[in-house]
């Protein structure tokens, strides 16, 4: 086991997990949204990782032999040496589909790590990204639905949603929900009430 210095730090969990398993086994064990960077002192390399669905972002760029990264593009752009040139291809995607597909962003030379990927950056500047999770059927344990009837599928989705909501309700701060007026957010609130055993405010 590990002796924690804090009483509830996600960051400390990452540090101990990295120390015990390395980055690839660590991300396999994480359940939820995350984006993190870890400097491996022994291996002399930087690791970046982004959650399976890509809820938490992580952006990066290279300039003059330096590798820069941040959770927001505006943090990278605080360096006046970073070019501010619009990526017209990404802009076209954004205006057409309201999204810029990873790894591109609206700025040339600034990229986002794709969802479900880790990236290893060595001291000589070489960066290698690789996928650690895939939602494509046949490559995900959740995709095995052949031969299941409708009731089994509905119950399975309900149980997965309920378990996911229950995990996300573990918090030391108040929890809130944005209601869009659609079915999905209303269903989430109903399941939250069920899990909490009380009405959700």
Regions found by a protein language model. Name each.
Residues 1-201:
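Cysteine-centered catalytic environments shared across enzyme families
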